[in-house]
Amino acid sequence: MSLKKQIPIIFENTHYFIVNKPPGIPSQPPDCRTWGRTHPNLDPTPLLERFKAIYYSHREVELCRTVHRLDHCVTGGMLIAKTKDGSVKFSRFLQKGGNNGYKLQRKYVAIVESSGRFNKPNNYEIKYGPKYNFLISHGGREITKFKEVDENCIVLQLVTGKKHQIRNHVSQILNQPILNDKRHGSTVNFPELFNDQIALHSACIITKIGLQTKTHLIPMEHNNTGQLWSRKYVNEEGEFTLPIKEVLLENWDQ
């Protein structure tokens, strides 16, 4: 595999890159005191450092900055801002929302186990709406929008972005851990190929800069053998099936 295929660029304009993050790569520098013990076979080099090394001949990569994070075992779209100013404006939106900075929204696809009964633990709540629903925890400090495609496939959109938020909400509130997410209760076993990959993919990134809105769909191409991600949901090219795409493209702002 060529280096550029390891972290493929899905889209590029004057403000940012969209890359398709593989599993097993941290998006931020990890704590080296624990990383070697918990992930002895994984290189701790973060995504941005690898990205710059691969695309070093590209004149704009030196000033690049990551704007958001994905857990090392999560795949899919990450936005990399080309400048400090762009990074600040995207971060401002993530912190304050509304018309602050550059708009950045992220939708994820998760394949979950069939527990089928929702939990109602203290400090957790589910709210249902006509288009989508809410998972809420810690008095509203952690909020995730979600919609079920079927009993094992969920599309989620972060409202807040706390560490492990989607993984926590799906396992603790819906009582349906993401496939292969052993840390959050998954019991289904997969081949060694998937040791550092769970069935959670950053599948759609929406940006708005000025009056221009762009929607990016990111294919699930990593270890796409039909095992972790069934052909019921992802075809051989990594594209999500039409029912999933339709939910990804729905406007959940209204």
Swiss-Prot record:
InterPro entries associated with the record: PsdUridine_synth_cat_dom_sf, PsdUridine_synth_RluA-like_CS, PsdUridine_synth_RsuA/RluA, RluA_PseudoU_synthase
Active site, UniProt feature: 71
Keyword field: Isomerase, Mitochondrion, rRNA processing
Catalytic activity: uridine(2819) in 21S rRNA = pseudouridine(2819) in 21S rRNA
Transmembrane annotation, as ranges: none
Entry's localization field: Mitochondrion
Entry-linked PANTHER family: 21S RRNA PSEUDOURIDINE(2819) SYNTHASE (PTHR21600:SF81), MITOCHONDRIAL RNA PSEUDOURIDINE SYNTHASE (PTHR21600)
Protein name, per record: 21S rRNA pseudouridine(2819) synthase
Phylogenetic classification of the source organism: Eukaryota, Fungi, Dikarya, Ascomycota, Saccharomycotina
Gene name linked to the record: PUS5
